[in-house]
From Swiss-Prot:
Pfam family, one: 7tm_1
Short motif 'Ionic lock' involved in activated form stabilization, span: 134-136
Modified residue annotations for N6-(retinylidene)lysine: K296
Keyword Lipoprotein assigned: yes
The protein's role, per its UniProt record: Photoreceptor required for image-forming vision at low light intensity. While most salt water fish species use retinal as chromophore, most freshwater fish use 3-dehydroretinal, or a mixture of retinal and 3-dehydroretinal. Light-induced isomerization of 11-cis to all-trans retinal triggers a conformational change that activates signaling via G-proteins. Subsequent receptor phosphorylation mediates displacement of the bound G-protein alpha subunit by arrestin and terminates signaling.
Glycan attachment residues as annotated in the record: N2, N15, N200
Species of the source: Diplodus annularis (Annular seabream)
Family: Belongs to the G-protein coupled receptor 1 family. Opsin subfamily.
Taxonomic placement: Eukaryota, Metazoa, Chordata, Craniata, Vertebrata
Transmembrane feature ranges: 37-61, 74-96, 111-133, 153-173, 203-224, 253-274, 287-308
Gene designation: rho
Protein name (record): Rhodopsin
PROSITE patterns attached to this UniProt entry: G_PROTEIN_RECEP_F1_1, G_PROTEIN_RECEP_F1_2, OPSIN
InterPro entries, A to Z: GPCR_opsins (IPR050125), GPCR_Rhodpsn (IPR000276), GPCR_Rhodpsn_7TM (IPR017452), Opsin (IPR001760), Retinal_BS (IPR027430), Rhodopsin (IPR000732), Rhodopsin_N (IPR019477)
Lipidated residues (S-palmitoyl cysteine): C322, C323
Biased composition (Low complexity): 334-353
Amino acid sequence: MNGTEGPFFYVPMVNTTGIVRSPYEYPQYYLVNPAAYAALGAYMFLLILVGFPINFLTLYVTIEHKKLRTPLNYILLNLAVADLFMVLGGFTTTMYTSMHGYFVLGRLGCNIEGFFATLGGEIALWSLVVLAIERWVVVCKPISNFRFGENHAIMGLAFTWTMAMACAAPPLVGWSRYIPEGMQCSCGIDYYTRAEGFNNESFVIYMFICHFTIPLTVVFFCYGRLLCAVKEAAAAQQESETTQRAEKEVTRMVIMMVIAFLVCWLPYASVAWYIFTHQGSEFGPVFMTIPAFFAKSSSIYNPMIYICLNKQFRHCMITTLCCGKNPFEEEEGASTASKTEASSVSSSSVSPA
């Protein structure tokens, strides 16, 4: 084995010289330069500085403006709530441990950080599944006269949290476990060991099949069918120009969220699977640290995509920030009016980008 395994940790360094210490008790500066830990702490501070205000603003603006409280936006708000959980429960913990160079908060802190990071990522993934299914049903119309309503949105929310908990909670109760990873200042699922009594192998396989491969397959199927339907509708001119534009722009926004999710999480998932299938092989602490911390940036991309691509939300946000007045009223107001008209015509009954 090209690492050192101990009680509830795995350090990617062979302890031939006796230098390796528990990441819960001692700084891990023998792994990388101390400056790297300072850089990680600064990075986490930046994510908190950006992630908390932008996600909180997304929630506040939607609550403040009644016209934004549409069923589809319930799912988008669900992403903001999940991101806030990651920021408050995970990022603050990781920033603090990075500043100390080891997981100074112990096993409890490791469980909290690992749980919130996993929960947030899974809520994002399953929310994208619900959005993809909604787009497919509304645009492709496999169910005639279907209208995505408030009850469907609430069921979608319950589904995303149930599935996310089914992935994030088991390591807390003994099916696998959360341990420090990479530079030992953030925690994740134990892909590294076959520790007796934790059944890591079965959990990792379960997680990759049920909580990564299957949801992504559903997403790709829905959007594959959706893109074909949009092209066919455009060619046949079956819908009004306003409705087609509305559906296309909502679809574009959700597809951008899927692409951003893959950019953030696919490197982490790929490295995790490689480590799991090559347990005992040699890899450095940075090998897992970079994709793990890159994945954490997912907390800011959803609201940014939403703000950039949804003119109605952007108009409401500017109005809120400017104390009820929009200095770009003429430009934004005209766009919002046209989008609101599109919303009333659209069979999805949403306020699209």
